[in-house]
């Protein structure tokens, strides 16, 4: 694939995720948008690693590291959302005022 096409696709994914993260009022949707942003960043890492230096796997290794961190972030985020839903019966961001007290 051509470098520009992959970068444009990655930019679209990043902007869709950023828009969803800013406009979302649901915690689960915000976590999904954050994962979309991280996947766009991973796409850039792999693309630049493949395009500029085929012999080294620095971009691919960093991409695997980001995937592992994103999996941990998703697990912890969903556990927090589950706990907030159990206590507040809502997953809306503006209704979770647990840290304000």
From Swiss-Prot:
EC numbers for this chain: 7.1.1.-
Domain of life: Eukaryota
GO function term, MF aspect, one: oxidoreductase activity, acting on NAD(P)H, quinone or similar compound as acceptor
Localisation per UniProt entry: Plastid, Chloroplast thylakoid membrane
GO biological-process terms attached to the record: ATP synthesis coupled electron transport; photosynthesis, light reaction
Transmembrane spans: 2-22, 32-52, 61-81
InterPro entries in the record: NADH_UbQ_OxRdtase_chain4L/K, NUOK/Mnh_C1-like
Keywords, alphabetical: Chloroplast, Membrane, NAD, NADP, Plastid, Plastoquinone, Quinone, Thylakoid, Translocase, Transmembrane, Transmembrane helix, Transport
Topological relation to the membrane, as annotated: Multi-pass membrane protein
Pfam families found in the cross-reference section: Oxidored_q2 (PF00420)
Catalytic activities: a plastoquinone + NADH + (n+1) H(+)(in) = a plastoquinol + NAD(+) + n H(+)(out); a plastoquinone + NADPH + (n+1) H(+)(in) = a plastoquinol + NADP(+) + n H(+)(out)
Any GO CC annotation of this UniProt entry: chloroplast thylakoid membrane
Database matches in PANTHER family: NADH-UBIQUINONE OXIDOREDUCTASE CHAIN 4L (PTHR11434:SF16), NADH-UBIQUINONE OXIDOREDUCTASE SUBUNIT ND4L (PTHR11434)
General function of this protein: NDH shuttles electrons from NAD(P)H:plastoquinone, via FMN and iron-sulfur (Fe-S) centers, to quinones in the photosynthetic chain and possibly in a chloroplast respiratory chain. The immediate electron acceptor for the enzyme in this species is believed to be plastoquinone. Couples the redox reaction to proton translocation, and thus conserves the redox energy in a proton gradient.
Subunit structure: NDH is composed of at least 16 different subunits, 5 of which are encoded in the nucleus.
NCBIfam families: PRK05715.1-2, PRK05715.1-5
Annotated family: Belongs to the complex I subunit 4L family.
Name recorded for this polypeptide: NAD(P)H-quinone oxidoreductase subunit 4L, chloroplastic
Gene for this chain: ndhE
